[in-house]
Regions:
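Carbohydrate-recognition loop of C-type lectin domains
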Residues: 1-64
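Short beta-strands and strand-coil junctions in structured, solvent-facing domains, enriched
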Residues: 39-43, 83, 87-89, 188-190, ...
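Surface-exposed intrinsically disordered loops and tails
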Residues: 146-170
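Surface-exposed interaction regions enriched in Ser/Thr/Asp/Glu
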Residues: 166-270
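Flexible glycine-/small-residue-rich
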Residues: 35-39, 115-117, 212-214
Length: 270
């Protein structure tokens, strides 16, 4: 399709200028939002959830996103959630960034994955980034990409690891020094690697999804990155505010949500 468009554009091009069609590079946002509500002000949890979902989808489709140079405004997003229904008392929301990397199967290839935003380092012990599963030459199990920061907290190295299942917290590192990571510039570089298959196939393309936590929750679609909010990959949970609802005036059994639920407790991207 791209070549056909280029041929058509040549008919109208100024002499000496060759039109170039660039593939879109998407930077996806995934949010995890715990939304508290007063049960006395809403007939059901489903009503609150439906209204929130609708408002977030409208924001995801708006012109504030879906373009180069777009900025996800964290405080505005929180307000959209809070204002969705009068019963909502607050929300705790964390943000993650994702790139979908097309894999060149059965060939030795290097991959540079730019996010255009600084990465947050939650653990100096590693596992700050997450990936979906894939297979590489020489290893019979699914592998995932992990990172370990250097002491300067500016860059680090990449490794491959395996898990018995995606929910496991007991990784086995099977190959070290397979690439490097620049936390400041938000760039992940995989050394030449032979990828044989990927767990995820999107629109007929073998894809590795790579997820990182931004240093700032205001995420920018920098330069050639087209910013989108992936509602389908986000998680919205509506929770009873037991204090506001009068069920627990002393707050002794109040459900507290972490503001740092970056990876949803997982080492990998399911």
């Amino acid at each position: 399709i791209k070549e056909n468009i280029k041929r058509d554009l040549k008919k109208y091009a100024v002499a000496g200028i060759v039109p170039e069609i660039l593939d879109l590079k998407y930077l996806y946002l995934e949010v995890t939002s715990n939304i508290y509500y007063n049960t006395n002000q809403a007939p059901s949890v489903s009503e609150v959830a439906t209204v929130v979902q609708s408002n977030i989808e409208s924001y995801a489709d708006s012109s504030e996103l879906n373009k180069y140079g777009a900025r996800f405004k964290y405080s505005k997003f929180l307000k959209i959630v809070d204002d969705s229904h009068e019963a909502i008392t607050s929300n705790i929301t964390s943000v993650a960034m994702r790139r979908d990397v097309r894999a060149a199967l059965n060939t030795l290839a290097e991959y540079q994955i730019g996010f255009g935003n600084q990465f947050h380092i939650a653990r100096m012990s590693g596992y700050n980034i997450r990936s979906s599963a894939f297979r590489v030459a020489g290893i019979t199990q699914n592998v995932y990409i992990g990172d370990i920061p250097n002491t300067n907290r500016e860059n680090g190295s990449l490794f491959l690891f395996t898990l018995d299942n995606p929910a496991s917290r007991n990784p086995t590192i099977v190959r070290r020094n397979v690439g490097r990571i620049d936390y400041i510039k938000g760039i992940i570089t995989l050394n030449p690697i032979n990828i044989q298959s990927t767990q995820k196939v999107i629109d007929g393309q073998s894809v590795i999804q790579v997820v990182a936590t931004p240093q700032s929750n205001d995420v920018i679609g920098l330069q050639d990155l087209y910013l989108q909010l992936d509602v389908n990959s986000s998680v919205f949970e509506v929770i009873t505010d037991s204090i506001a609802s009068g069920l627990d005036p002393s707050a002794s059994s109040y459900t507290v949500s972490s503001s740092y639920n970056y990876n949803r407790g997982l080492l990998v991207k399911p």
